[in-house]
Structures are given as structure tokens and as C-alpha cells.
Amino acid sequence: PQHRLVSDLRPGDKGTIVAVKNTSVPFLQYLDKLGLTLGTRLEVLDKILFDNSLEIKVNELSKHLISVEVSRNLYVAE
């Protein structure tokens, strides 16, 4: 399957997290806090045009707003 950056997804798109670009400890801890770990399903609910942040749903449960910096460092497979 083709891997895509979360930042390239549009509202309604779904994917499973398969890789991270930034492997710094603070970034990985932040992802863990949000429940965004490898194998996690996410769906893009909305894209904020002002700053390209994304509203996402994680594992059909919780909703989060993630910055463009976060979405540029996460890869998903459909």
C-alpha cells in the first residue's frame, strides 16, 4: 500500500498510522499522549484553512486538533 503524509489528506480521508518522520523523544511522547501510535486508525474530519491544522478522529473514538507540523511528520496507509 502507498504511504501518504497526514498533511496531504482531505476531510473524509482515513488511514492507519504506519510511520513517523520525526523520531525525537518529545514528538513521540506527544503522539503517545494523543493516542497516535503505529497501527492507529484516524479519519480527517476538517482542515482549518487558516493554518492547515487538522481535526481528526482517532480509532472512531476521540477527536483531536493537530498542527501542520504534526501532520507533516505522520505517514498513513489507506
Regions found by a protein language model. Name each.
Residues 1-70:
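Mid-protein regulatory/catalytic core that forms ligand/cofactor-binding pockets
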Residues 68-70, 74-78:
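Amphipathic alpha-helical interface segments
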